[in-house]
């Protein structure tokens, strides 16, 4: 896989929350850290995402969002 993004974190999908159009995919990247990303339901299907599957969280500096609770 060749991509321009330099921040690539390998992990395992721990849960997928399906909505009507999008899904929130939670990836355990180790060290007690879970990264969450909103993707389309079409992407979930195309990538065959399912709990337990290895996946990469790919982060481009121009696409980072920050939130607080």
From Swiss-Prot:
Gene3D superfamilies: 2.40.50.100. InterPro entries: Mo/tungstate-bd_C_term_dom, Mop_domain, Transp-assoc_OB_typ1. It comes from the Bacteria. Keywords: Molybdenum. The keyword Nucleotidyltransferase does not apply. Residues 2-68 form the Mop domain. The keyword GTP-binding does not apply. It holds the Pfam family TOBE. One of its GO terms (biological process) is molybdate ion transport. To C.pasteurianum MOP proteins. NCBIfam families: Mop. Binds one mole of molybdenum per mole of protein and contains a pterin. This is Probable molybdenum-pterin-binding protein. It comes from Haemophilus influenzae (strain ATCC 51907 / DSM 11121 / KW20 / Rd).
